[in-house]
């Protein structure tokens, strides 16, 4: 019983049953393994960079719109006729001087964030009219009438809530 012709050395299989590393298929496998390892290293490195970036300092503007911020008023009103809370005072100064000198104490700081990401801050005092406050916000950030009315109602609720606390 003869198994057949014995393979010649270097032709089909080498003695010992090892793979022929010169074969083209093995080169493709090794190239794919190396590419996979390189890609895996890049992904792990990017994940490490992302974790490092999370520990950066917080942004300068507050993320919560109801965050109360204390801004002391100037004692000498004649030296500072404008309230620094109302930026771009061209719109607010033309509507009257009583808005610049609030009659009551500070209730809360209203911060409205527009769709563009711009934040408008207005301090609401005890005697303020919700309609005028919503007009101040819409002077900085254009609002359509239904949004302005909704903002007015929300300001009214917040004023009532804070006045009941004091």
Swiss-Prot record:
Q: Where is this region: Disordered?
A: 32-107
Q: Where is the composition biased (Low complexity)?
A: 91-104
Q: Which family does it belong to?
A: Belongs to the UPF0561 family.
Q: Which InterPro entries match?
A: UPF0561
Annotated protein name in UniProt = UPF0561 protein C2orf68
List the Pfam families: UPF0561
Q: Where is the composition biased (Basic and acidic residues)?
A: 34-49, 73-85
Q: List the disulfide bonds.
A: none
